[in-house]
Amino acid sequence: MKKLLLMLVACMATMTAFAGDEGEGWSKGFTPVADKADLAGIHTVVAADGSVFASSTYNQAFQFAGKAVTDPDGLLSSCVLKYDAQGNELWAVSLVGKCKIYAMAADTDGTLYIAGQSQDEKVVITDTQGHEKEIQNPKRLSPFFEEFVSANEGFFAKIDKNGVLQSIVTLIPEVNPDILAIVGDPYEMGMEGSIYDYSFNDPVYVLPRKIVLDGDKVYVAAGFTGDIAELGWKGCYLNYFGMNESIFDIKSFGLFSMDKNLLNLASIATVQATEKVQTMSQYYPETIDFVVYDGVPHVAFIGGGELTLTTAAGSKNFAFEVTDDGLNHALVLANVNAPEQPKVFNAAPVDYLGAKFNLVDATLADGNCIMAGTFYGNFPLDNTVTKDKNVSFVASIKMSDCSVNWAKANEVESEAQCMIVTGEEIHAATADAHYVFRTSDGDLKKAENQGFNDASCYNDQYCSTIFTQENSVVVFSPKMKPSGIDETTALKNGATKYYNVNGVELSAPQKGLNIIKTADGVKKVTVK
């Protein structure tokens, strides 16, 4: 308890980075595991009323909101906790069974959407009314080990503001027996240069990365291997050394949508190796992210070799240089309605097994896409910058023409964890540091030695962050400055600015509620 109290004191000291000199807000902690190595799935999201959701793995019983969270019987399970805007504990929902939550999003009415992965034959969700729902994860025969193992399926759940489970859907990856003989990780077989990120005895997977609510749709980005029947996605199998049968499946990424009842799933885009690869050359996408701009998804991905972006509007092939010096890890931005007109940011080839390429978030602000991630070697967004270590970055890209407004790379070895934009500030975090940039020009305003696992904000009014310390999880919500819309400076030409109900700027009014601010500062709400 003493250790947790010290954490909360340190946490309060960092709040000034969000709230100015006042440092007001609240901070709470809980201890869900006995060993810090078991902490995972650490995420947070803040709702329109300022209430805060937090997720974590857990393997020991603990109290929350005056009740015991369902005993996981030692299983590394997951839980979702809710606090009100003042930090009071409200409720907990448990997911008992080996699983992990990877992303969360909250609707304006307080409804919570979670995206995770089940790694167990069965995961039981227990809501606040005691209702139980099982996530079934069927076992399959692993040809190499001749035993049955569970696939790592993706699951998506809708929980109302009172913690009552509304609906759930799963995506179960299938092994194509006519193509795939063995699935696994070459590292487990002593092969270097692995391009696979799952264990040798895990056949296939769906790994959610991001979930976004826009209008009446839920958008999800995910990594996958194998075939996903519900979306029509196919694995991109490796014909290793020209053998007649594939023995590995190269990771792919996709974006799909569903309605808010988690029905009517539809594929939007996939990024995969162009053809069945016959060598261990690194032809694969590394990561994916997206934004929804004027109701249209725009994807961003990093990858190398021969890749194909496929959407309902068509497809686009890419060929990124592979040389003796390594691989050109390019960053690509594309409108899913016009995949044939992407913006490609190339980089000089780099050859380093430990290179990290990742996008942790992309969001819209003032007509720009603000993104954060990690790279190694030559910086795709600024080729004058080259690093001999993995470093985090933050960048601003103009949506109208995909030109780079500015791009900043870290000076120290680091990996990006999360990012949020609050008005004229970008808060980007690594595991052990928090950086504050000015949105307009990327100027570094402040840096603190306290990293975050995740962060969330709503309309510049509410914010939540979450991080770990030893085997505990800390959630804090600083008191924010006035709404970014209230503080917005009118464009010099006197143009009217449009926002959706979440405070995201639009190029024009969209269907539904719109907030309009005129040059003289007058705001009004209209329905289109």
Predicted regions mapped to residue ranges:
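Positively charged n-region of N-terminal signal peptides that target proteins for export
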Residues: 1-4, 528
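Hydrophobic h-region of N-terminal signal peptides that target proteins for export
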Residues: 9-18
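Short linear motifs in exposed loops
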Residues: 72, 136, 507-509, 526
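Residue-level detector of functionally pivotal "anchor" positions at catalytic/ligand-binding pockets or at interdomain
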Residues: 476-504
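Extracellular Ig-like/FN3 beta-sandwich strand-entry sites
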Residues: 511-513
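C-terminal tail/sorting-segment detector
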Residues: 515-528
